């Protein structure tokens, strides 16, 4: 039976050790966190001097890759040059912080929402994202950036596999960029994971390559196929349902990846319970 690397998105309050204790409490073997505030301010809780020891402790405890989530405020596809420049600089700083964790032997990725073109058109937006990532990697390149599959809300770029492939093709150092597969977003974008799992995986492989998918955001969907809503539901309580998640955790290609829950904490034990539920679905 395959052991899942799984956990949720955790608060950084209290610093590195408190972060790990929260993971222990939910029974996790992977997790996500924001490296700075949602508005982009650097975190006072995450002292860079403690990053290497944190990474060494995770490695010693057998954790799967961390999937750190960049703040939503970053928009590499935006019109505002000052905001775009901030996103490039801040993402490079995030990579520098996380490089110490990776140097200690613990794999870590940083996940980003690719960006929104805000009326400039998807082609322009995708080009700007590629160019922005190239600038980021000129400053710092010790950690892989994962582009998240998006639901297609508003002017989001990355609303389908082909757009993500276009962005990745524009990145000069291909080894620096991969993909996070968000189950809710992929369904909401119009890919029928519920009824055509194999077909969706073939499309993903043809457009991007399954080997470039490095992490999974494990979320059910409130509104479902083609809704473009991006509204997460708790596991088994949405349009995907338990049969889909059973298929996912028994797919040898996908089940080896770190799985991050981004579902609503309805009770203090929601994520602990969902982690146990998903592990219980493994054959």
Swiss-Prot record:
<keyword id="KW-0255">Endonuclease</keyword>
<dbReference type="GO" id="GO:0003906">
    <property type="term" value="F:DNA-(apurinic or apyrimidinic site) endonuclease activity"/>
</dbReference>
<dbReference type="InterPro" id="IPR013022">
    <property type="entry name" value="Xyl_isomerase-like_TIM-brl"/>
</dbReference>
<keyword id="KW-0227">DNA damage</keyword>
<dbReference type="InterPro" id="IPR018246">
    <property type="entry name" value="AP_endonuc_F2_Zn_BS"/>
</dbReference>
<keyword id="KW-0378">Hydrolase</keyword>
<protein>
    <recommendedName>
        <fullName>Probable endonuclease 4</fullName>
        <ecNumber>3.1.21.2</ecNumber>
    </recommendedName>
</protein>
<dbReference type="GO" id="GO:0006284">
    <property type="term" value="P:base-excision repair"/>
</dbReference>
<feature type="binding site">
    <location>
        <position position="148"/>
    </location>
    <ligand>
        <name>Zn(2+) 2</name>
    </ligand>
</feature>
<keyword id="KW-0862">Zinc</keyword>
<dbReference type="InterPro" id="IPR001719">
    <property type="entry name" value="AP_endonuc_2"/>
</dbReference>
<feature type="binding site">
    <location>
        <position position="113"/>
    </location>
    <ligand>
        <name>Zn(2+) 1</name>
    </ligand>
</feature>
<feature type="binding site">
    <location>
        <position position="232"/>
    </location>
    <ligand>
        <name>Zn(2+) 3</name>
    </ligand>
</feature>
<feature type="binding site">
    <location>
        <position position="182"/>
    </location>
    <ligand>
        <name>Zn(2+) 2</name>
    </ligand>
</feature>
<keyword id="KW-0234">DNA repair</keyword>
<feature type="binding site">
    <location>
        <position position="217"/>
    </location>
    <ligand>
        <name>Zn(2+) 2</name>
    </ligand>
</feature>
<feature type="binding site">
    <location>
        <position position="262"/>
    </location>
    <ligand>
        <name>Zn(2+) 2</name>
    </ligand>
</feature>
<feature type="binding site">
    <location>
        <position position="69"/>
    </location>
    <ligand>
        <name>Zn(2+) 1</name>
    </ligand>
</feature>
<keyword id="KW-0479">Metal-binding</keyword>
<dbReference type="GO" id="GO:0008833">
    <property type="term" value="F:deoxyribonuclease IV (phage-T4-induced) activity"/>
</dbReference>
<dbReference type="Pfam" id="PF01261">
    <property type="entry name" value="AP_endonuc_2"/>
</dbReference>
<dbReference type="GO" id="GO:0008270">
    <property type="term" value="F:zinc ion binding"/>
</dbReference>
<dbReference type="GO" id="GO:0003677">
    <property type="term" value="F:DNA binding"/>
</dbReference>
<keyword id="KW-0540">Nuclease</keyword>
<comment type="similarity">
    <text>Belongs to the AP endonuclease 2 family.</text>
</comment>
<dbReference type="InterPro" id="IPR036237">
    <property type="entry name" value="Xyl_isomerase-like_sf"/>
</dbReference>
<comment type="function">
    <text>Endonuclease IV plays a role in DNA repair. It cleaves phosphodiester bonds at apurinic or apyrimidinic (AP) sites, generating a 3'-hydroxyl group and a 5'-terminal sugar phosphate.</text>
</comment>
<feature type="binding site">
    <location>
        <position position="185"/>
    </location>
    <ligand>
        <name>Zn(2+) 3</name>
    </ligand>
</feature>
<feature type="binding site">
    <location>
        <position position="230"/>
    </location>
    <ligand>
        <name>Zn(2+) 3</name>
    </ligand>
</feature>
<dbReference type="GO" id="GO:0008081">
    <property type="term" value="F:phosphoric diester hydrolase activity"/>
</dbReference>
<feature type="binding site">
    <location>
        <position position="148"/>
    </location>
    <ligand>
        <name>Zn(2+) 1</name>
    </ligand>
</feature>
């Amino acid at each position: 039976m395959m052991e899942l690397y799984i956990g949720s998105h955790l608060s950084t309050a209290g610093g590195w050790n408190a972060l790990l204790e929260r993971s222990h409490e939910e029974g996790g073997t992977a997790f996500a966190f924001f490296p700075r505030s949602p508005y982009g301010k650097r975190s006072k809780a995450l002292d860079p001097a403690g990053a290497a020891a944190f990474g060494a402790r995770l490695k010693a405890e057998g954790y799967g890759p961390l999937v750190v989530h960049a703040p939503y405020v970053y928009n590499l596809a935006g019109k505002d040059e000052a905001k775009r420049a901030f996103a490039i600089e801040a993402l490079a700083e995030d990579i520098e912080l996380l490089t110490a964790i990776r140097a200690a032997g613990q794999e870590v990725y940083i996940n980003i929402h690719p960006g929104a073109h805000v009326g400039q058109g998807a082609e322009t937006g995708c080009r700007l994202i590629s160019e922005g990532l190239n600038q980021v990697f000129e400053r710092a390149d010790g950690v892989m950036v994962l582009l998240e599959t998006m639901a297609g809300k508003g002017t989001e770029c990355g609303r389908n596999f082909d757009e993500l492939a276009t962005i990745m093709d524009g990145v000069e150092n291909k080894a620096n960029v991969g993909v996070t597969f968000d189950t809710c977003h992929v369904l909401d974008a119009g890919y029928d994971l519920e009824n055509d799992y194999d077909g969706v995986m073939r499309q993903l492989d043809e457009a991007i390559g399954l080997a470039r998918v490095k992490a999974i955001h494990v979320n059910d969907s409130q509104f479902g196929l083609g809704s473009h809503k991006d509204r997460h539901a708790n596991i088994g309580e949405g349009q995907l349902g338990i049969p889909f998640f059973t298929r996912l955790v028994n797919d040898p290609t996908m089940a080896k990846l770190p799985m991050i829950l981004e579902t609503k904490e309805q009770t203090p034990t929601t994520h602990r319970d969902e982690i146990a539920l998903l592990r219980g679905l493994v054959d």
